[in-house]
Design a protein with these regions (language model features):
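Fungal secretory targeting signals
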Residues: 1-27
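Soluble FAD-dependent oxygen oxidases
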Residues: 23-505
Length: 505
């Protein structure tokens, strides 16, 4: 720690000794107080009166309007610590913002928060002795995966968006096309480097309480400086990208198709190397899949499923394309895999709901029929566009218990996503979220009636849930442990920074 940094922390600390009148003035104008403190500390920052504010507060999610007090742009660890000092002096929460994608805008924090942009933390390094990759807290999916592939011919599971923040999507569960046989991005993590609320840097390794908490609730405990993950060499140089067209099915046939896929996935005929995303918004009902086993075996592997689907709809068809492994990565996550920063931000005004189904409570045909009838078939809006899918999970999750990570995802079999995008990208209908919640409610009721607990997905946070609902769906019985760990690593609640952050007990 150099003397300049020490002097700057001292200068910031003197603000704690300011007169009561000054403290009162700071409380009345938190943004100005934060800007003054950050400027004194030598950390670049913006507040709402600055010309770049609109650009800096633009995220992927357009439905939720963000309102932080200030954003700091630290260029190194010392400046992250100074940013934390300023936030504590102003008695405001801190929200680390990774790659600034922020699917549900939670990266921009609660109103009045200090957002710490991690954009400068975009380094990547590879340890050939362990085959582990370390990436900064501000990296995007595309550039990191391309670096790893171009330089080392290796891969690790990741979400299906090249521009998405890699750290945030990985600690939020993450689910990708190779997750059935390699695990989720979160399952592949080896360690995380945190800066805690008081500027202390901790390397939390697998097996530690803090690492466990990071796997599903990472943004609630500190600033992620870097993340280390295990990597894998593909078994084959090529992979098979395939599509299934189930045709124009009614709700009964659509439900039967889902159960046919489920039965196939649980049979000895389905290898973990096969992934499938099946459409919820239809008809027609289609699937996009990826096969990472021996390409020569694909026709034999898929045959039992094709036979089952043809028995439901005689017009069911399968088409396939064999691609070099990296080309498959681009097919999965988009052209941004070959572009700086993973391409462009884009964005929509949308509301997402997500549920996971486990092997302990697989879908019944009646439940699947309720899902289709109450959502995509019942949908009747002209100001919203429906969207939805069922990701086949299963695979290696059979060996995971809910208590293994903060996010309870043991034995997950399906990841179901149901959402609606506003036709007007600048706003969302006032009754839109209520309408969409009403559509999925019969399916939720059917799950509960069948004895299944409602489970969610961290990366697809349902912003309209109460604390009792989201804590149960995401963390289950792990929630009490998470709150206890909060008292150890964030006793001042600095990182109680959004609606679904882990609170103090």
């Amino acid at each position: 720690m150099d003397s300049t940094f020490s002097l700057r922390r001292l200068a910031v600390a003197t603000l704690l000794c300011a007169s009561p009148a000054l403290i009162s003035a700071q409380a009345e104008n938190k943004a100005a107080a934060l800007q003054s403190c950050l400027t004194t500390a030598g950390v670049r920052n913006v507040i709402s009166t600055d010309a770049t504010w609109a650009d800096e507060t633009t995220g992927f999610q357009k439905r939720i309007k963000v309102d932080p007090a200030a954003i700091s742009f630290p260029e190194n660890k010392d400046q992250v610590a100074l940013s934390l000092d300023c936030a504590r002096n102003a008695s405001t929460s801190v929200s680390p913002l990774g790659a600034a994608h922020s699917f549900q805008a939670y990266g921009f924090g609660n109103p009045g928060s200090l957002v710490i942009s991690m954009a400068a933390f975009n380094s990547v390094s590879f340890d050939a002795a362990t085959n582990r990759l370390t990436y900064g807290g501000g990296t995007h999916v595309g550039p990191v995966l391309k670096y790893l592939w171009d330089n080392h011919g290796r891969h690790f599971p990741h979400v299906r968006g090249a521009h998405v923040g890699l750290a945030g999507s990985s600690i939020g569960g993450g689910y990708g096309s190779s997750s059935r046989h390699l695990g989720t991005p979160m399952d592949n993590l080896e360690s995380v480097e945190y800066m805690l609320y008081n500027g202390t840097i901790v390397n939390a390794a697998k097996g530690s309480d803090l690492f466990w908490a990071a796997q599903g609730a990472g943004a609630s405990y500190g600033v992620l400086l870097s993340v280390t993950t295990n990597t894998h060499k593909p078994l084959f140089e090529t992979a098979v990208n395939f599509t299934i067209n189930g045709g124009q099915l009614d709700s009964t046939a659509a439900a039967k198709a889902v159960i046919a896929i489920q039965d196939f996935s649980l049979s000895k005929d389905c290898p973990d190397e096969l992934a499938l995303r099946w459409s919820l918004s239809g008809p027609p009902y289609t699937g996009t899949g990826y096969f990472y086993g021996n390409p020569a075996d694909f026709d034999t592997v898929i045959a039992p499923l094709v036979t089952a689907l043809k028995a439901i709809g005689s017009n069911a068809t399968v088409a396939k394309t064999e691609l070099p492994f990296w080309d498959m990565e681009v097919a999965v996550a988009g052209a941004g895999m070959n572009q700086p920063n993973g391409g462009t931000l884009g964005g929509r005004s949308f509301y997402t709901q997500a549920l996971t189904i486990t092997t302990d409570h697989p879908l019944t045909e009646a439940q699947a029929k309720t899902l289709y009838e109450s959502t995509t078939i019942a949908f009747n809006r002209t100001d919203l566009r429906k969207s939805g899918f069922l990701d086949l999970w299963g695979g290696v999750s059979r060996d995971i218990a809910d208590a293994d990570t903060a996010y309870a995802h043991g034995k997950n079999l399906w990841l179901i996503r149901w959402e609606a995008n506003s036709v007007d990208a600048t706003s969302y209908p006032a009754d839109g979220t209520t309408y969409m919640k009403g559509l999925i409610k019969p399916f939720e009721d059917a799950l509960v009636a069948g004895g299944a607990p409602l489970r969610g997905f961290v990366n697809y946070a349902d912003t309209e849930l109460s604390e009792a609902e989201w804590s149960s769906r995401l963390y289950g019985s792990n929630f009490d442990r998470l709150k206890q760990l909060k008292t150890v690593y964030d006793p001042e609640g600095v990182f109680v920074n959004h609606k679904q952050a882990i609170p103090l007990p």
